[in-house]
Amino acid sequence: MAEEQQQPPPQQPDAHQQLPPSAPNSGVALPALVPGLPGTEASALQHKIKNSICKTVQSKVDCILQEVEKFTDLEKLYLYLQLPSGLSNGEKSDQNAMSSSRAQQMHAFSWIRNTLEEHPETSLPKQEVYDEYKSYCDNLGYHPLSAADFGKIMKNVFPNMKARRLGTRGKSKYCYSGLRKKAFVHMPTLPNLDFHKTGDGLEGAEPSGQLQNIDEEVISSACRLVCEWAQKVLSQPFDTVLELARFLVKSHYIGTKSMAALTVMAAAPAGMKGITQPSAFIPTAESNSFQPQVKTLPSPIDAKQQLQRKIQKKQQEQKLQSPLPGESAAKKSESATSNGVTNLPNGNPSILSPQPIGIVVAAVPSPIPVQRTRQLVTSPSPMSSSDGKVLPLNVQVVTQHMQSVKQAPKTPQNVPASPGGDRSARHRYPQILPKPANTSALTIRSPTTVLFTSSPIKTAVVPASHMSSLNVVKMTTISLTPSNSNTPLKHSASVSSATGTTEESRSVPQIKNGSVVSLQSPGSRSSSAGGTSAVEVKVEPETSSDEHPVQCQENSDEAKAPQTPSALLGQKSNTDGALQKPSNEGVIEIKATKVCDQRTKCKSRCNEMLPGTSTGNNQSTITLSVASQNLTFTSSSSPPNGDSINKDPKLCTKSPRKRLSSTLQETQVPPVKKPIVEQLSAATIEGQKQGSVKKDQKVPHSGKTEGSTAGAQIPSKVSVNVSSHIGANQPLNSSALVISDSALEQQTTPSSSPDIKVKLEGSVFLLDSDSKSVGSFNPNGWQQITKDSEFISASCEQQQDISVMTIPEHSDINDLEKSVWELEGMPQDTYSQQLHSQIQESSLNQIQAHSSDQLPLQSELKEFEPSVSQTNESYFPFDDELTQDSIVEELVLMEQQMSMNNSHSYGNCLGMTLQSQSVTPGAPMSSHTSSTHFYHPIHSNGTPIHTPTPTPTPTPTPTPTPTPTSEMIAGSQSLSRESPCSRLAQTTPVDSALGSSRHTPIGTPHSNCSSSVPPSPVECRNPFAFTPISSSMAYHDASIVSSSPVKPMQRPMATHPDKTKLEWMNNGYSGVGNSSVSGHGILPSYQELVEDRFRKPHAFAVPGQSYQSQSRHHDTHFGRLTPVSPVQHQGATVNNTNKQEGFAVPAPLDNKGTNSSASSNFRCRSVSPAVHRQRNLSGSTLYPVSNIPRSNVTPFGSPVTPEVHVFTNVHTDACANNIAQRSQSVPLTVMMQTAFPNALQKQANSKKITNVLLSKLDSDNDDAVRGLGMNNLPSNYTARMNLTQILEPSTVFPSANPQNMIDSSTSVYEFQTPSYLTKSNSTGQINFSPGDNQAQSEIGEQQLDFNSTVKDLLSGDSLQTNQQLVGQGASDLTNTASDFSSDIRLSSELSGSINDLNTLDPNLLFDPGRQQGQDDEATLEELKNDPLFQQICSESMNSMTSSGFEWIESKDHPTVEMLG
């Protein structure tokens, strides 16, 4: 086909215009011009062409020829050069008449082969592929094939490809399964313009150009075809065309005197040298014209001659591949394919030079956002070449590609290493790109380091928002699963940005464990191709042998660098969309354009090391020069400042699923942070060397994201101080990360695995985290950290804005902070907002790190609590005493119970989730936003809860150490919070099984279940609780828009609502609300839970154990979801407690609940009394656990909002609310006013979580629960029950709380459906009238359009409307839902909710005067036996069924029967 297509070109080979095919009608005049063709062939070609032309045209041509004959040679040459090339109008009309021309087919064929590649785990919507092809044709002026013809060619190119219909009901699309866009686009071969060769060479130059145009693969394919044909004709096998040619010559089938024959015979023995360039040229022309001729010409000799010439040409190409100096030039592309580097050197340098130019062709892909410049990803690190695997990940760093292209051809295409490779970078070889990796600035020492995991899948997701087509690219070191990038995501500790980072071999251990800088710069957008081209990361580790291997977590510092690029990308995206205003301030407008060129330097200072920390600090300096053109980090970070996230209307307006711009970017950034955190923890586990890493990051800000994302969109300079202490116990004061750049915010994630304090001062992020080298958490260290952090926040007002994070009170940090403020001249509030978002990201990152099993010793980013300085700044102060005491107790309990699980309990937090991974709690705060996406995918059910991390500041108002609480919750919630973002925005398609799965429906053609979700829901769901295929109602609810109510395909759904009205079922449904929330993030965790349940069927399994195993299960299933795991652990604990509380429900159900609130809630759906209890407990737990309440509060202000709902609703309507949240939207106000304050109180009481929670819950619950009590009777009741149960096993309940929060959060997402909201209102103030509640929720929804509400939240209205929140409870919930509906529904919602929480009066949420615990307990007991409560539960069930939860009831019924 190639030859036929090239028929026109042969006519003008001498014209040196091989690229554009000349009009065929010019061919008649040209035969004489084709000296390469023998007379017979030329005449045959002429005759063939003449026959295809009508008589009138022939006569015209004859007339023209007569005129031309009068011209002089010079005039003829001029005429020839003036002949138009390309398709003439007449030809186009002819083509339209025809179904398709060979040229069109070849264009389509080449486009498909150059643009798409097989990838078993991805699918591409057919329409998108065709649309891209059409735009490609439009850009080049080709006539596109019809969709049907294109589909046929697709089948020819990918014979193994199958069509699938993916998507939710009513939104499904037909997809090509097993395909993905290429991560690297091969440079199109341009004609060779080097004529400085011998006569032979000159002749060969043109052919070489033509050969280049003929893809090497095409040539090899043609050779195979020729050999096959020859074997049939000559009945003799030929392995190569050369063999065939020699056979033809020897057998005298063709003349032996021709130059080609002599060349073949001479070259055959010599191997390569025999072939001459001229011969190559002749065959080229001949083959082009001859193949058709073979059919046309009757004489076998002609056919054989053509065949021979073609063979000769092929032979030449092959020889060129082999080191043939003369031919290597002509066939350099081929040589590149084989051993491009070696051959190229042999070949003429001149030829090579053109190829580097060709690399720039990357621009050609521009029509196709998928940047396929394999060069960049591959080239990033020499290791990368060996790591060909990394390339397969499809790091789509369009920006990077562009950047590298701009920087130097070498970076993009391996030009220096293998110029030939550029063109020859055939699909088979592109992944290798080993040598060029070096060319790219980044060198990754550890192959694993470079994870462009998300890119392939992400790309698919990205489509929704083209702004960040690179979203997928976001490198989530942590098994993102794209986040965009998420896919992704190899948990491999090292996540290298597409740019890749060079890390010292010394640092390798660190790098291996995710210390690798994960640069998202490539991921943010393809559009930012112009951004800085390359990321140079130099890691100069100063290693102290003193360090204990166990405490080698320090390397995570390296990971910080990647964050910056990510942030930058996000920023750029924001700039494109519009200036993003911090939600809080809304004042700060950063011009994205300026950011683009800026290089942010993130300097990590190890200055502030605690004396103890200095024990063995391994300091490695990482200079991360990141040209992060687009940092997707931008908006999502802002979730804490919900407004800022969606501030950018463009970003916000994106489809809710794919809030790519802000959400995705943010998502991506968090993934970066997360990976960093994870890497840190991984490094810790791997025993990497401790030490603070200094990073000099130059990050061109694609655009500064104002507001929460970077929170500090200050100057491009960011200094990150991270110090780790050998003594993990001591907080790393010195490990304060000061990030002045919003982009650097990502760096905030504590790099030091042992201890990290990340402080965000102004835009500076101070990450203070203490992580144990051992898996166990050291309460003392935490206390110290908390104190240090507190001091810092106290000392610096600016920091106070960031006070959410406990910032070590180091003068250096303060100075940094101040300096940052001064430098930036940014309002502290803005910074505070940014910090908040950053903190969230950091938190999430930590959680993510936690979620990775490897990071039991997550550095605690306790400091990362973003003091949502906006409105909740006052809440941010840590209660050191409470935090320390409770942390110690809780940590002990949690460690014991969840030591195996990486439940990232925040040490400072009330220890609610304190588990072996005490670090996590802090991390969720800062990582929250960034990690959000990560987390979401990691842990669907945990998602909502995590979101609150940023918000925690407001929530914890009553407690001096609200941050810990929020962080604690973040531990469990951060995941959920992030998850939503991550899932929706970042990994919509397949980023994470969980996160993705929920969000996938919205933004992606992929199935609801994301890759994270291990097996099908059927496999995952608890055998007892028959969950719908979605397996997590919460999952569906979370992405209500995207996912319809879980379909009950998996099991019969004959149950009637009446049955579900059983009292226990009613209670369970109240729990279901929770569960649904959990369900939101439950899918993955739910599956894990289910599996766990399968493993632990006994109904009375020890709650701690049960949830622990489940937790682990989570970790196993979602390495990146590990943070979720803790949440799930908490939730599981609560559920277990519920079980203990006296529901003798089959273990599987309990396990469901226990495993994960979400899971449990799902189970609850299958209405098992135990599950209901669990749900109730979960709801209650959230409140009881003081930490969790904070987290909840955080959710309101931030993406955590849903979680806030969980808390508030949980508190007031723990059971009903959870259901309601999903089915009925309980007004945020109601939730906040009643249960929430109690929850907060609980959180405040860190000392003895159980006692404190009980006491606080009691007093608060008295007011709120009783007042709300009737409203949220179910939830109150549940909350009390949960509280009591949780209090009994404090470790368990803390675990449960986060889950509940998550559940709540999920239900919030569910909010989108008004009916759901209404149901939630079943908790509606004492009146449990579903109808009224529905009206309220509907009104709230009406008031807040999802998208508009998201935008409002992003704009900062939510934060500002703190008091409004109370009045707007329902609307806020709706907002949350609406946020969720926008691209990052969950994240957005959380962010909106969090903002609301932030703005909320702390007293509303958590009345310091009230003690929730006691009241809760009493109320729970009362509710348990309260007919009104039961009625409410039943009503909520009914409303749920009415609102489309009939499937749940159906599910529940069989489950109920089974349970009965």
Curated annotation (Swiss-Prot):
DNA-binding region: 108-183
Motif PxLPxI/L motif: where in chain: 188-193
Biased composition (Pro residues): 947-963
N6-acetyllysine: residues bearing it: 704
UniProt superkingdom: Eukaryota
Biased composition (Low complexity): 515-535
Any one GO CC term of the record: chromatin
Signal peptide as annotated in the record: none
Region (Disordered): 1-34, 308-352, 404-428, 481-585, 632-715, 917-1015
UniProt GO MF annotations: DNA-binding transcription factor activity, RNA polymerase II-specific; RNA polymerase II cis-regulatory region sequence-specific DNA binding; RNA polymerase II core promoter sequence-specific DNA binding; sequence-specific double-stranded DNA binding
Keyword Transit peptide: no
Modified-residue entries (Phosphothreonine), positions: 564, 988
Principal location: nucleus
SUPFAM superfamilies from the UniProt entry: Winged helix' DNA-binding domain
Statement: the UniProt record of this protein carries the keyword Transcription regulation: yes
Regions of compositional bias (Polar residues) in chain numbering: 337-352, 404-416, 481-513, 563-583, 632-644, 705-715, 917-933, 971-1009
Localisation: Nucleus
Biased composition (Basic and acidic residues): 537-549
Family label: Belongs to the RFX family.
Domain writeup: The PxLPxI/L motif mediates interaction with ankyrin repeats of ANKRA2 and RFXANK.
Illness the protein is tied to: Intellectual developmental disorder, autosomal dominant 71, with behavioral abnormalities: An autosomal dominant neurodevelopmental disorder characterized by global developmental delay, hypotonia, speech delay, and impaired intellectual development. Most patients manifest neurobehavioral features including autism spectrum disorder and attention-deficit/hyperactivity disorder. Other frequent features include hypersensitivity to sensory stimuli and sleep problems.
Function: Transcription factor. Acts as a transcriptional activator by binding to promoter regions of target genes, such as PDCD4, PIK3IP1, MXD4, PNRC1, and RFX5. Plays a role in natural killer (NK) cell maintenance and immunity. May play a role in the process of ciliogenesis in the neural tube and neural tube closure.
Oligomer and partners: Interacts (via PxLPxI/L motif) with RFXANK (via ankyrin repeats). Interacts (via PxLPxI/L motif) with ANKRA2 (via ankyrin repeats).
The name this protein goes by in its record: DNA-binding protein RFX7
